[in-house]
C-alpha cells in the first residue's frame, strides 16, 4: 500500500542488487505489505466503494498524497467519511473477498518450506488482512494491521490508534519489534509503496513490487524492483 510519507527518506546506504538477492536467500523473515502487493486491491478504497463513498475517499487520498498530512490524520479523515458498520465490513469480505496477486501463494509456500518466517504488515484493516493470511497459511499472530472499532450495535466507532501501523513509520516500528522479539538478524521487506520503502532500515533489505501498480518514486529508489512474484521465486530456487 502506498500513502503519504511526510518524512524525507534517509537511507544512508541502500543494498546493491546482488546484496539484496543474497539477503533474501538467507533471510530469517520476510515481511509483506498487503494492499497492492499481496492482494490486487487497496482495501480502504474497496471499502469506500462498497459503502458508496468511493469518489470522495479517492479524492482525499489524492490530496493527501501531496504530503500535507500524516498517515494517521489521513486514515482518520477517510474513515470518518466511510463510517462503515461491522455488518458492511463482513459483507464486503463475503461478497468481494480480497484477490490474491498471482504467484504470492507459491512464493509464501516456498518461504515456509525454507523455514523463513512470513509476516503481513499493513496500514489496512486487520479484519481484511486476516482473511488474506488464512488463504496463505500465515499464522494470525504474524499479522500487523489496523483494527476497526465498533459500538455494541455494530456502528463505526473509530480505529485503534495504539497500533504501530496507525502511525507514519509504523512498518519500521513493527520490524524493529520483530527483530527484538524473535532475534531475527536478516529481515526483508517487500511492498509497492513509500511506507514500505521507509521501513528499510530497520529492515535489512527492501524489494519494490510493481505487479499491481508501479510507483515511480519507489521504483527509482529500489535496488531490486520486480513486477511479479515469480521473479523472487526463481531467484530462491537457484539454490
Regions found by a protein language model. Give the residues of each.
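Alpha-helical substrate-recognition element adjacent to the catalytic core
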Residues: 2-147
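C-terminal cap/substrate-recognition subdomain and adjoining C-terminal extension
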Residues: 2-5, 95, 99-117, 124-239
